């Protein structure tokens, strides 16, 4: 594979199916990174939106089926699987969440399974889904990315939803005054009222940075790990197009080895996202700083 072809192949697989306003004023799909960039902020990554919604519906369908078929007698395979998942997540919540809220465990379960499903799409060979999109659309140049968590828009959206819950529960539990005091009266304090007033800007700067870092680090951690994993799969796929038998053979070995290792990564990243969400919401429920 020539360097230009390999470079184009990689860029094509790292570009989202973007819909927005083209430079000529019409609306349509971007066929290059330059066109996608020219669309500006109001552009939609339809592949990210479509796959995230579809996998969310699959999650709901599977768990609904398990709930409808649940029995107190001999459980089936699906019921066993769902019960194991629920017990695992419920145990994680009990160990890490010290407040009282009926929504934390269902939220944690939703996050873990949904993120895991979005991550798991990365195990599908990199050319299969893009080629299917080309076959359906009839456009040989249309890009398509199936792994929603390799799009920072998706991970940031999920993280800022968690951030909104952090703010909501902080104000609900501590009150608006308590929340503002948490941001302005810590970590530095003084019994002298004038010194305390002088410390408010410093405290606010430190606490605000700490607060806003939570969703950003939550999003970028998931995005960075999944993006790197996808890039490795793409680079391995380039080996298959090299035309060299030994390099293609090495690609087969690396593909299987990385896929097996990646199963651990996709599970671990879903678990980390879930656990950090639980910990952050637990901190929001604490009365004291």
Curated annotation (Swiss-Prot):
<feature type="transmembrane region" description="Helical">
    <location>
        <begin position="160"/>
        <end position="180"/>
    </location>
</feature>
<dbReference type="GO" id="GO:0045259">
    <property type="term" value="C:proton-transporting ATP synthase complex"/>
</dbReference>
<feature type="transmembrane region" description="Helical">
    <location>
        <begin position="259"/>
        <end position="279"/>
    </location>
</feature>
<dbReference type="InterPro" id="IPR023011">
    <property type="entry name" value="ATP_synth_F0_asu_AS"/>
</dbReference>
<dbReference type="InterPro" id="IPR045082">
    <property type="entry name" value="ATP_syn_F0_a_bact/chloroplast"/>
</dbReference>
<protein>
    <recommendedName>
        <fullName>ATP synthase subunit a</fullName>
    </recommendedName>
</protein>
<keyword id="KW-1003">Cell membrane</keyword>
<comment type="function">
    <text>Key component of the proton channel; it plays a direct role in the translocation of protons across the membrane.</text>
</comment>
<keyword id="KW-0997">Cell inner membrane</keyword>
<dbReference type="GO" id="GO:0005886">
    <property type="term" value="C:plasma membrane"/>
</dbReference>
<feature type="transmembrane region" description="Helical">
    <location>
        <begin position="43"/>
        <end position="63"/>
    </location>
</feature>
<dbReference type="GO" id="GO:0046933">
    <property type="term" value="F:proton-transporting ATP synthase activity, rotational mechanism"/>
</dbReference>
<dbReference type="InterPro" id="IPR035908">
    <property type="entry name" value="F0_ATP_A_sf"/>
</dbReference>
<dbReference type="Pfam" id="PF00119">
    <property type="entry name" value="ATP-synt_A"/>
</dbReference>
<feature type="transmembrane region" description="Helical">
    <location>
        <begin position="232"/>
        <end position="252"/>
    </location>
</feature>
<keyword id="KW-0812">Transmembrane</keyword>
<dbReference type="GO" id="GO:0042777">
    <property type="term" value="P:proton motive force-driven plasma membrane ATP synthesis"/>
</dbReference>
<keyword id="KW-0472">Membrane</keyword>
<keyword id="KW-0375">Hydrogen ion transport</keyword>
<keyword id="KW-0813">Transport</keyword>
<feature type="transmembrane region" description="Helical">
    <location>
        <begin position="103"/>
        <end position="123"/>
    </location>
</feature>
<comment type="similarity">
    <text>Belongs to the ATPase A chain family.</text>
</comment>
<dbReference type="InterPro" id="IPR000568">
    <property type="entry name" value="ATP_synth_F0_asu"/>
</dbReference>
<keyword id="KW-0066">ATP synthesis</keyword>
<feature type="transmembrane region" description="Helical">
    <location>
        <begin position="193"/>
        <end position="213"/>
    </location>
</feature>
<comment type="subunit">
    <text>F-type ATPases have 2 components, CF(1) - the catalytic core - and CF(0) - the membrane proton channel. CF(1) has five subunits: alpha(3), beta(3), gamma(1), delta(1), epsilon(1). CF(0) has three main subunits: a(1), b(2) and c(9-12). The alpha and beta chains form an alternating ring which encloses part of the gamma chain. CF(1) is attached to CF(0) by a central stalk formed by the gamma and epsilon chains, while a peripheral stalk is formed by the delta and b chains.</text>
</comment>
<keyword id="KW-0138">CF(0)</keyword>
<keyword id="KW-1133">Transmembrane helix</keyword>
<keyword id="KW-0406">Ion transport</keyword>
